[in-house]
Amino acid sequence: MYFSYLCTRKNQINIMTMIPLENYPYTDAQIQERIAEYTRKGNPYMDEQQACRFILNCIDLTTLEGSDNRAVVEALCQKAIDFKDDARNIKSTAAVCVYPPFAAIAKEKLKGTSIHVACVAGAFPAGQSPIEVKLAEVRYALEQGADEIDMVISRGKFLEGNYQEVFDEIKAIREACANAHLKVILETGELKTADNIYKASQIAIAAGADFIKTSTGKIAVNATPESFLVMLDAIKAHYEKTGKMVSMKPAGGISDPETALKFVSILANVLGEKWMDNTHFRIGASRLANKVFDKIQ
């Protein structure tokens, strides 16, 4: 099926000739040293209260469970809406993230707000379906009202060195998304090494990702400061070469304000103030929002 799909595409791009995939320039020890340094420095652009407001406004409030239904999704959307408090200068979350069958429900519930509808699509979370099936699900989500698509790369193909097919799949989904934002999940817990994470980030960026995202939240190892830093370094290297800002989304396991503040401090120290808005930074979370909201004075 993949061969038949490729035969229908024009102007095939060879990822290996388009960009030379670079090895990650830091050792594991240097990664730890940098994380400690950035954590110690903190956020140079915001105090803690400002950072908590920023974090809340960057959350993709998420429900991705087999038990999801209309009532669950409508309640999630109402929760996202209710965080907004003009008197306390608190904005709503950036988006809600749901499975494609609930996109239309979320779209209707969020009508008249600034909150986007994000959908996981493309054989989330395993990515183990033919590209034709992935594209069909992405198109369905968009037809149902999704503003943003969160796809996951084919880790098995990446780990066997089939970088071209990984690139082609992301590129095809990018084209299907048209004006919708595409977040590309690397599932860093399965990629294992910093070098793999860095190369996968380069492939996703080259294929047109608007965001690169750490994790599905469906395996044991989700967003870590280490994987987050490696991905930020890939974004920074791309920006220094091209001037293009690629956005970042850690997701999975960020369930308390202290952890979220640490991630934001790393973001601020690596990429700077230009990335400090919800166009360029998101956090995927379900439990974090209430705790951050309660911390805001």
Task: Briefly describe each language-model feature range.
Residues 17-59, 87, 243-297:
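C-terminal alpha-helical cap/extension of soluble enzyme domains
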